[in-house]
Amino acid sequence: MMKKYSLTTHSTETCQILFTSVSNVFKYIPSGTRRILIMYQDSVSQVLPIFSAASGVQCYRYLIPDSESAKQLGVAEQCWRFLAQNNFTRSDLIVSCGGGAASDLSGFVASSYLRGIKIIHIPTTLIGMVDAAIGGKTGINLKEGKNLVGSFYSPYIVLCDPSMLTTLNEEHLKSGLAEIIKCGFIQDESILSILEHNAQDHMDCSQRVCAETLPPKLLEELIHKAVSVKITMVDSDFRDTHKRQFLNYGHTLAHALEAATSHKLSHGQAVSIGMVYAAQVAFAKGLIGRNILTRHERILETYGLPVCPPEVQWRNITPYMQRDKKNMQNNDTDSYKDSREIPQISTQSKLVLLRDIANPFITSVSHTVLLEAYEAMFPQ
């Protein structure tokens, strides 16, 4: 049975997020569309035969690189040129098929070609369904950091088919679980409770739960809960100036680690480490008790996600953290100040922290505290 969500963007337009079979995609092609560019990753080429049934529409295929290697200016330029060479107009359509990197890149291409061409996202990974494809953020990477170039551009439709997740490997599932767990910490604690209860039933002798053993109905329930969290926050703050930034929980260190390690860490692995780090910072500042920090570590470790950073020196991380978008705005949402901190831009960074489960806020933290929290994550 189809389930539908509506997301209001910065304009009067509404993006529909549909949970239905991918074979229904042609029901949602805008009238007047003459050409469709299918931007796909090699890992999802099995979706392509669906588009061979198109009637009255000319379909083009464009293979893009897998994972973060897709999010480069050179790749975006090649896509723009392909669109131009094949005479795509504003009345035509892009369809992206793939993971989070596919929607980030294709959304950016769609937002900038002819200053805007319609796009439908078909996320084929868990992280795509619960995060990357929803909300209208697009982005490509620079050597100086992740997602430093991008736009806010809402897709026409996001079509999610959970049956496509049955072929995902363990690592891709774990990456998506990290984003689902994040939603549990920042808004919906029932997500954490569901995962903890499931762990009691499926834990192996190593005290771990294989993500591939998650019952399909349970996984779909978690997907809907995470999507609801994201829609709630994006609906009230499409341009990411306040409440939507709570979705960035764990991402300040995560993006820095991804860049500093040349994306050897997956996004989900980095977010997992980043959430534990944010909890460590909040604990160091006396905002949360050790029980909440321990809960972060326990649930993430149980599902096979890392809680300790790789061996990356702090001085190699701080330049990326200072470029975090939250540092560009005066958006503290709490009056909490550490009297020992000197409010200088060069000595502080803004993070999303917790006062409690489902009680996030944004505040400035001194680099002294940030370093101490980072060092505390390594085994003594």
UniProtKB/Swiss-Prot annotation:
Protein name: 3-dehydroquinate synthase
EC number: 4.2.3.4
Binding residues for NAD(+): 100-104, 124-125, 137, 146
Organism of this sequence: Tropheryma whipplei (strain TW08/27) (Whipple's bacillus)
Main location: cytoplasm
Functional summary from the UniProt entry: Catalyzes the conversion of 3-deoxy-D-arabino-heptulosonate 7-phosphate (DAHP) to dehydroquinate (DHQ).
Pfam family, one: DHQS_C
Disulfide-bonded cysteines: none
NCBIfam families referenced in this protein's UniProt entry, alphabetically: aroB
Keywords, comma-separated and alphabetical: Amino-acid biosynthesis, Aromatic amino acid biosynthesis, Cobalt, Cytoplasm, Lyase, Metal-binding, NAD, Nucleotide-binding, Zinc
